[in-house]
């Protein structure tokens, strides 16, 4: 799909998703606001698309004359980074999550998200994202860390930085990645805890739209596979190298020769493991791929790749090593 100007893209998105109308219907905790909620949310979404690193920089858009004209904002309606943060703090998270899921289903029906499947499956991936960072606290749920800054005189000092993190579940099949939903981490909370909460909330409604959920080495654990497989889907995670299954595949590599991939100088060992069968009510597969050819450094190709999955090994392309 090709797009022209951002104005055309915005017009198309409003036609398919009715964005402005739906954003304007979201609950606004303010009393008689002068700054429309739809303008705030459109600014926030545009900042996310541009991967703007902080709320201050996103909020600066509300002072940009051209951006305000695009939103139809008048000078007396105001708008600042601090005001943007205050409005976002008052959003109803349940409504926002529901709208994101509706957007995914609308994009699927409109043919924007196609079934150019990966591994023969319709895939979504889990990943940790940092939403905003700022030297000003926005809400009680902000996480905090320290950083070193340098002033105009070259003197260094330590300041507190406040930020939010969220685990996102994103559609990965086809040329357009799409965030289906996310879960914000509470202060002191780990990525896996938030991710499991996200999966438990979304997967029952995605059974007809997804086949496979992907994760990095953090997700190579019983709770991830139990949650995904329990929802009737398949899971795949990069091996952490610290499970009983790693010991089993290491022993297999010492005793059995690999299978060589036709047309590629890639060695593959694969096996079924019963290590977590009691908890998962099924076996997991372990696949270890090893590249036997030299690759240019600029390609950043892995020398080895080991994955753990509930998908039958014959479905996975052995050349991924």
Stretches found by the model and what they are:
Residues 85-174:
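Active-site-proximal, Lys/Arg-enriched surface segment
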Residues 188-247:
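Domain-level cores of phosphate- or acyl-group-handling catalytic modules
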Residues 2-45:
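Basic, short loop/linker segments at the boundary and entry of helix-turn-helix/winged-helix-like folds
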Residues 146-209:
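Electropositive, glycine- and tryptophan-enriched low-complexity nucleic-acid-binding patches
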Residues 171-173, 183-184, 217, 237-241, ...:
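Short, structured patches in soluble enzyme cores that scaffold and shape functional sites
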Residues 31-102, 221, 228:
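Short, positively charged, Gly/Tyr-enriched micro-motifs
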Residues 234-321:
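An anionic, glycine-rich sequence signature occurring as long contiguous blocks
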Residues 43, 58, 80, 84, ...:
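Short, conserved catalytic/metal-binding motifs centered on acidic residues
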């Amino acid at each position: 799909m090709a797009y022209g100007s951002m104005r055309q893209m915005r017009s198309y998105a409003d036609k398919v998703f009715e964005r402005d109308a739906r954003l304007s219907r979201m609950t606004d905790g303010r009393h008689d606001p002068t700054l429309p909620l739809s303008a705030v949310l459109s600014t926030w979404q545009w900042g996310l698309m541009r991967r703007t690193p902080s709320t201050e920089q996103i909020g600066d858009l509300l002072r940009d004359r051209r951006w305000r004209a695009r939103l139809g904002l008048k000078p007396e309606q105001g708008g600042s980074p601090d005001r943007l943060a205050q409005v976002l703090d008052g959003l109803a998270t349940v409504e926002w999550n529901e709208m994101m899921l509706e957007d995914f289903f609308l994009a699927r029906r409109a043919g924007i998200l196609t079934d150019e499947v990966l591994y023969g499956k319709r895939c979504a991936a889990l990943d940790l994202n940092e939403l905003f960072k700022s030297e000003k606290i926005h809400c009680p749920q902000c996480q905090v860390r320290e950083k070193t800054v340098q002033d105009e005189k070259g003197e260094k000092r330590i300041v507190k930085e406040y930020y939010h993190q969220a685990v996102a579940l994103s559609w990965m099949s086809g040329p357009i990645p799409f965030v289906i939903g996310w879960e914000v981490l509470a202060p002191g909370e780990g990525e896996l805890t938030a991710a499991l909460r996200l999966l438990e909330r979304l997967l029952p409604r995605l059974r007809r739209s997804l086949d496979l959920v992907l994760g990095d080495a953090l997700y190579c654990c019983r709770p991830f596979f139990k949650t995904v497989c329990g929802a009737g889907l398949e899971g795949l995670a990069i091996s952490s190298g610290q499970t009983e299954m790693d010991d089993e595949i290491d022993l297999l590599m010492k005793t059995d020769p690999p299978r060589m991939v036709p047309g590629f100088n890639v060695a593959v060992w694969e096996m079924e493991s019963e290590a977590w069968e009691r908890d998962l009510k099924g076996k997991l597969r372990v696949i270890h791929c090893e590249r036997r050819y030299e690759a240019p450094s600029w390609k950043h190709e892995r020398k080895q790749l080991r994955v753990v999955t509930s998908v039958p090994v014959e479905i996975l392309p052995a050349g991924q090593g």
